[in-house]
Amino acid sequence: MIDNICRGELYIADLNPYEGCVQGGIRPVLIVQNDKGNKFSTTTIVAPITSNIYTKKHIPTHFTIDYALDRKSIVLFEQIRVIDKNRILRYIGKLNSKDLKNIDNKIAISLGIEKV
């Protein structure tokens, strides 16, 4: 298990098994759980990432990343899920501080949270 996972970091994770239209397989994910939860829990909260940007209809819960990965990709905040940290395979990189602020908005949209 990888230690010291932090919010905003990108990892390769094993999202198998999966069913239907849910993103699965070995793929990049963005850690969205807060750092306290990451420190003390054996699970973390992630958003899967896809590089199939031309086959996905762009919706308000999507966030495009054009750095840190091999190719331009989309973070799918409508598919946020909890995974065991044992499913995290390797570190890829980290979002910059500007993008970290933007993902809060995408998470709020996905969960139906109104701005306070």
Locate the predicted segments by residue.
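Conserved functional hotspots at enzyme active or ligand-binding sites that engage polyanionic ligands
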Residues: 1-116
